[in-house]
Curated annotation (Swiss-Prot):
PROSITE patterns: RWD (PS50908), ZF_RING_2 (PS50089). The keyword Magnesium does not apply. PANTHER family: E3 UBIQUITIN-PROTEIN LIGASE RNF25, RING FINGER PROTEIN 25. Pathway: Protein modification; protein ubiquitination. GO terms for molecular function: NF-kappaB binding; ubiquitin protein ligase activity; ubiquitin-protein transferase activity; zinc ion binding. The modification Phosphoserine is found at residue 450. A zinc finger (RING-type) spans 135-202. The lineage of its organism: Eukaryota, Metazoa, Chordata, Craniata, Vertebrata. Changing residue 159 to S: Reduced activation of NF-kappa-B. This is E3 ubiquitin-protein ligase RNF25. It comes from Homo sapiens. Interacts with UBE2D2, and may also interact with UBE2E1 and UBE2E3. Interacts with RELA/p65.
Length: 459
């Protein structure tokens, strides 16, 4: 009973409830109080402070919410002070306000100090009723004689900057409204049109565009840049480095790289003559002269491909009068100009050699070989089957020459039935008489020996 009586007497002596009632009668709805459980938990007092501008809200550019946590030992203990939702104040200003309010609280220990703390906060805001920071549109600070405005959400802009922003947003909203007109007509629920919003917090803006446009444009101070000695030294060093890299090809020219594959059609290139083209006037020359000119021409030698390992071609003398000289000349030119092609079949023509003395060696293992008829008269000397190099229209095997007189690849072998015409004296069923075995020029066991003798003689 005695403890409860002492607690009741202590609560009656506590000055906080009576002080809160006085504050509520002064600030009315601006003050919010969260009462604790007697003296066991602290009370919390919230109040939003503005500069004293004779209730002219348009001239109030700064504000903050003051929070006081009153302990149970109040007034013999200082309340905990904090600031929430500051507008137009820098961090340094907020820190200064907290320090000033702390000094006031310590000076009023043992007495009612809540009213003094609230009024001191208002006084500081009145003295600093200039927004601190930058215009978020132009990113420049506010000067004393510049025309700026404050939104209901306590964000600050130059009047000229805000007018330009509002005009731009109205044009965008108009364009979006035209695009979404059909969607709004078919929509079941009508969406409320959204006006111009604050560029910081997206709250709807209330503005007078005419008055904002009439405001003068803010004059920003022009700061002349003066490089220091260190910056000038660095510029010279980078300039020398750039020149050195450019001389060594380390700098990529974007314009040159962009136009590397650009083809201009204003100046057409000169028509290039085909390298494989042969003058028509050379057609009247004999094949030997034409072959010599083609072999000595550097253009033809550079364009012709390297010779391929093809089988040696053997061309026998044809019966004179079978073809005209003009056709032979055309075939000679075609064989010299066309590159050699490998054989399409799986087999390759075996290499044949014509040894000296007129002996003709046939490949081993061939059964259906055609032998030449015996001569009518006695054979006085061996007949050389090699054609003359300057015979008209006759193609011979390529002759081996020095390394500096290469005449191109050997002519391509063409399977032309016209070149191997049947003689007029032969009939479809006739054949050449065969020689007895062992009496011909062919010796089965002497092929390798004859080849070895040729290599030793160097012929």
């Amino acid at each position: 009973m005695a403890a409860s009586a002492s607690a009741a007497a202590g609560e009656e002596d506590w000055v906080l409830p009576s002080e809160v009632e006085v504050l509520e009668s002064i600030y009315l709805d601006e003050l919010q109080v969260i009462k604790g459980n007697g003296r066991t938990s602290p009370w919390e007092i919230y109040i939003t402070l503005h500069p004293a501008t004779a209730e002219d809200q348009d001239s109030q550019y700064v504000c903050f919410t003051l929070v006081l946590q009153v302990p149970a030992e109040y007034p013999h203990e200082v309340p905990q002070i904090s600031i929430r939702n500051p507008r137009g104040l820098s961090d340094e200003q907020i820190h200064t306000i907290l320090q000033v309010l702390g000094h006031v609280a310590k000076a009023g220990l043992g007495t009612a100090m809540l009213y003094e703390l609230i009024e001191k906060g208002k006084e500081i805001l009145t003295d600093n009723n200039i927004p601190h920071g930058q215009c978020v549109i132009c990113l420049y600070g506010f000067q004393e004689k510049e025309a700026f405005t404050k939104t209901p959400c306590y964000h600050y802009f130059h009047c000229h900057c805000l007018a330009r922003y509002i005009q731009h947003m109205e044009q965008e909203l108009k364009a979006q409204g035209q695009e979404q007109e059909q969607e709004r007509q078919h929509a079941t629920t009508k969406q409320k049109a959204v006006g111009v919003q604050c560029p910081v917090c997206r709250e709807p803006l209330v503005y007078d565009l005419a008055s904002l446009k009439a405001a003068p444009e803010p004059q920003q101070p022009m700061e002349l840049y003066q490089p220091s000695a260190e910056s000038l030294r660095q510029q010279e060093e980078r300039k020398r480095l750039y020149q050195r890299q450019q001389e060594r090809g380390g700098i990529i020219d974007l314009e040159a790289e962009r136009n590397r594959y650009f083809i201009s059609l204003q100046q057409p290139p000169a028509p290039a003559e085909p390298e494989s083209a042969v003058d028509v006037s050379k057609g009247s020359q004999p094949p030997s002269t034409l072959a010599a000119e083609l072999s000595t021409s550097p253009a033809v030698q550079s364009t012709l491909p390297p010779p391929l390992p093809v089988a040696t071609q053997h061309i026998c003398e044809k019966i004179p009068g079978t073809r005209s000289n003009q056709q032979r000349l055309g075939e000679t030119q075609k064989a010299m100009l066309d590159p050699p092609k490998p054989s399409r079949g799986p087999w390759r023509q075996p290499e044949r050699r014509h040894p000296k003395g007129g002996e003709c060696h046939a490949p081993k293992g061939t059964r259906d070989t055609q032998e030449l008829p015996p001569p009518e008269g006695p054979l006085k000397e061996p007949m050389d089957l090699k054609p003359e190099p300057h015979s008209q229209g006759v193609e011979g095997p390529p002759q081996e020459k020095g390394p500096g007189s290469w005449q191109g690849p050997p002519p391509r072998r063409t399977r032309d039935c016209v070149r191997w015409e049947r003689s007029k004296g032969r009939t479809p069923g006739s054949s050449y008489p065969r020689l007895p075995r062992g009496q011909g020029a062919y010796r089965p066991g002497t092929r390798r020996e004859s080849l070895g003798l040729e290599s030793k003689d160097g012929s």
